[in-house]
Amino acid sequence: MLKNDYKKEVENSLDLIYEEVDKRIADKEDDEAKEIVNKGLKSLVGLDIGTIEVFSFHSISEIIDRENQYNSMKYLAFGCLMSLMGKIYSKKSEDTSYVIYYEKALDGFYKAFSEDEEINEKYTEDAVDTCKELSKYELSIEIDKKILRLYEMLNKLDKAEDTLFYMLQKTDNDGSIILEGMKFYNRLKKKEKEVLSEGNLPFEEVEDGIAELERRMGI
């Protein structure tokens, strides 16, 4: 199957799954919604939810990469479906155990967008929504770093910067995070000014960010 045909097939399948899951959630049919997601995982990713819940993302990634064809779309489907699973569980969960699904969704979106720059823009908001959901919780600094990089890939540069300064506040201006921030701004300085403006972080604000990091370093 040609790549564009495969992409369209995955997109159409995801559209139908989103529509059906949203309907089931609205009707409070959570078990049916979970089964729809599980069938989607088997069809689009080749794994069921039981396997995904047990395996680390590293192991899942190794399985997906074995076929070495159209992997970015499999990662995209994984991200979308894990985000849906988080949404289903969050509606009735009394704790935050469902956050693990959003963490897996983040991993999926990160891999998808890092491997394929031509993913349909309509999935950008799905990835952004996952980042926003995770930002509600106190998570590891490694997850924060991944959120920053995903925002950067999606050209949501203002959100990436917000994440950076959240990390600085969280770590009391840890030197390694300041260095991470300097690398972030230096990458942005290489972008066209129009791209920076589209990302809601104009060149002047990039320079302001560098100056602020230098101030925190005592330079």
List each model region and its residues.
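Alpha-helical adaptor scaffolds
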Residues: 107-155, 169
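N-terminal alpha-helical interaction modules that lie
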Residues: 1-92, 99-115, 159-165, 171, ...
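Extended alpha-helical scaffolding segments
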Residues: 145-198
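Structural signature of alpha-solenoid helical repeat junctions
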Residues: 70-73, 77, 97, 101, ...
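Short alpha-helical linear motifs
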Residues: 57-62, 123-127, 185-188
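"A position-specific structural signal for the A-helix of alpha-solenoid helical repeats
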Residues: 19, 77-84, 126-129, 133, ...
